[in-house]
């Protein structure tokens, strides 16, 4: 189902949601951190979704073990490097990795700015080593409040040339986008792109707010857009992309089953929607699974899957020249 003549992208992929279980085990031993299990086989149920979680917040607790072992900046650098290695292994030509340095820093009180620098170093080294093209999206974790998000923003701004976009993720219901207007004003002033997690736990009004108040050019998940016909029309007309994450939305119980996922309807409506993983390490999936298993189960035709693959590059935070060069590079292989 993947068109090998086209670039394969993943533009909604959390770096801190893709920490290998083996790495969690090794870092736990290295830093003498107590883990819920001492072998890879027995650890996996604690760090990967085995059965669908009842809600988004329950799903997010599965992420915690990955960041609990980030006891040093070297550990942060390692998982960033491994994220690029994983992207290469799964055949990705281009990936946008998003991360929350405050979340990564929290368990061991690491310097937030230091985490940003370590992630940049690890990703750059990975790109040089494995030949994958990558850009970084800074996440503000809304769950920790406005002040913590301000600290994350300042850390990103210190490396503004290495950050491509700003995102807002976490507890969408408890911390609406209206709390973060000034943060996004500064991000736009820095020349960054804007993508926002919206319409995952909250309704279509959260998506409208992300677009109108925060300046979102893309929406993460956005499944609740299906409830508002005017919003669907607006997304299509303005070419505001939806970063769909099929398996993730089932595992968080955002959508009941793949057959009910709105991605097919987004594509039929002319909305620029793409296929992405979200937190592949926690989900136990990769981009190949999303294209070859999840997308057909969601009712997408072969042509719709191809269109979603095309959309992934069209939506990417790349210049027109960068997109052209990537197309030519893949076509020449």
From Swiss-Prot:
Substrate binds at residues 14, 16, 170, 279. It catalyses: adenosine + H2O + H(+) = inosine + NH4(+); 2'-deoxyadenosine + H2O + H(+) = 2'-deoxyinosine + NH4(+). Keywords: Hydrolase, Metal-binding, Nucleotide metabolism, Zinc. Zn(2+) binds at residues 12, 14, 197, 278. It is an enzyme of class 3 (hydrolase). It comes from the Bacteria. One of its GO terms (biological process) is purine ribonucleoside monophosphate biosynthetic process. Its EC number is 3.5.4.4. Binds 1 zinc ion per subunit. The keyword Zinc applies. CDD domains: ADA. The active site is at 200 (proton donor). GO terms for cellular component: cytosol. Signal peptide: none annotated. The record marks 221 as: Important for catalytic activity. One of its GO terms (molecular function) is 2'-deoxyadenosine deaminase activity. Its cofactor is Zn(2+). PROSITE patterns: A_DEAMINASE (PS00485). It holds the Pfam family A_deaminase. HAMAP family: A_deaminase. Catalyzes the hydrolytic deamination of adenosine and 2-deoxyadenosine. Belongs to the metallo-dependent hydrolases superfamily. Adenosine and AMP deaminases family. Adenosine deaminase subfamily. This is Adenosine deaminase. It comes from Escherichia coli O7:K1 (strain IAI39 / ExPEC). The gene is add.
């Amino acid at each position: 189902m993947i068109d090998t003549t086209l670039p394969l992208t993943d533009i909604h992929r959390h770096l801190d949601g893709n920490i290998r279980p083996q790495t969690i085990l090794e870092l736990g031993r290295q830093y003498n951190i107590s883990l819920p299990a001492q072998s890879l086989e027995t650890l996996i149920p604690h760090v990967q979704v085995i059965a669908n979680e009842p809600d988004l917040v329950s799903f997010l607790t599965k992420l915690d073990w990955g960041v609990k072992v980030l006891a040093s900046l070297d550990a942060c650098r390692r998982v960033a490097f491994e994220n690029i290695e994983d992207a290469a292994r799964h055949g990705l030509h281009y990936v946008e990795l998003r991360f929350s340095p405050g979340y990564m820093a929290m368990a061991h009180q690491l310097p937030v700015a230091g985490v940003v620098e370590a992630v940049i170093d690890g990703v750059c080294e990975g790109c040089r080593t494995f030949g994958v093209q990558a850009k970084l999206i800074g996440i503000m974790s809304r769950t920790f409040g406005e002040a913590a998000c301000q600290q994350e923003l300042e850390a990103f701004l210190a490396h503004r040339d290495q950050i491509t976009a700003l995102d807002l993720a976490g507890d969408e219901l408890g911390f609406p986008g209206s709390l973060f207007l000034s943060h996004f004003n500064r991000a736009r002033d820095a020349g960054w792109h804007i993508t926002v997690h919206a319409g995952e736990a909250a309704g279509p009004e959260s998506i409208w707010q992300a677009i109108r108040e925060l300046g979102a050019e893309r929406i993460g998940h956005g499944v609740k857009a299906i409830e508002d016909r005017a919003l669907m029309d607006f997304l299509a007309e303005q070419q505001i992309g939806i970063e769909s994450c099929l398996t993730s939305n089932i595992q968080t119980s955002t959508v009941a089953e793949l057959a009910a996922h709105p991605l097919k309807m987004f594509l039929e409506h002319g909305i620029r929607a793409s296929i992405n993983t979200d937190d592949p390490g926690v989900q136990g999936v990769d981009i190949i699974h999303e294209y070859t298993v999840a997308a057909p189960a969601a009712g997408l035709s072969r042509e719709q899957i191809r269109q979603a693959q095309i959309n992934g590059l069209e939506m990417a935070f790349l210049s027109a020249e960068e997109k052209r060069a990537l197309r030519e590079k893949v076509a020449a292989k």
